[in-house]
A protein has these predicted regions:
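Surface-exposed, charged secondary-structure patches
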Residues: 61-136, 140-145
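Primarily extracytoplasmic ectodomains and periplasmic/lumenal surface modules that are beta-strand-rich
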Residues: 25-29, 104-106, 179-181
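Core segments of small alpha/beta cavity-forming domains
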Residues: 4-78, 83
Length: 182
């Protein structure tokens, strides 16, 4: 959790700062509100990317493509759209902070294109094998499919991301045992 030492706690500013450092890699407000150093604040964004990339650790994604995917996911995170609403103080002293999120539709928007390009690649492999060329290894084929997926996502990001219907989420902030908000 994040630590806050201010006497006059502003839950709306706190949530805004946490979202900005988590998704936009904007650290200034977060540093001011939490007392974190610039390095600590930047680490929040990097840790979120680490968590995203951990999901691929057990996947057959080629190691050489991981830095490209990491950078792309960072760019995608920076495009997340949210609005922090008016805070409501709960009876137990905690705060309920409504956040309206517009989800990115990149992955669903690009799925059909990816499927089509993956099928085209499979057809190319079949054609070349039928013409007497060696069958690519599973690793080579998986590597090519991950490259295709990266290219499709990259194209989607470059052509402008689209958003789905806004959803409302409520974040709850309370003091922990040390008297810090998280």
């Amino acid at each position: 959790g994040c630590c806050v030492y201010l006497n006059r706690f502003d839950p709306e500013a706190y949530v805004q700062a946490v979202l900005e450092v988590s998704y936009k890699k904007e650290t200034e407000e977060y540093e001011e509100i939490t007392g974190a150093s610039k390095e600590e604040a930047e680490a929040v964004f990097e840790e979120n990317l680490d968590a995203t990339m951990e999901e691929f650790e057990s996947s057959p994604m080629p190691k050489e493509l991981r830095p490209q995917y990491r950078e792309l996911f960072g760019e995608i995170a920076m495009q997340v759209s949210y609005t922090v609403g008016e805070v409501h103080r709960e009876d137990d002293g905690s705060y309920a902070v409504p956040v309206t999120v517009k989800p990115l539709t990149l992955f669903s928007d690009t799925y059909d294109t990816f499927q089509q390009k993956a099928e085209e690649y499979a057809d190319q492999v079949t054609d070349s094998v039928m013409q007497g060329e060696a069958m690519p290894s599973d690793d080579e084929m998986q590597s090519e499919v991950y490259q295709i997926y990266y290219d499709v996502l990259r194209e989607g990001v470059d052509s402008g991301l689209l958003y789905g219907e806004a959803r409302n989420v409520t974040l709850h902030i309370a003091k922990n045992a040390d008297g810090e908000y998280e």
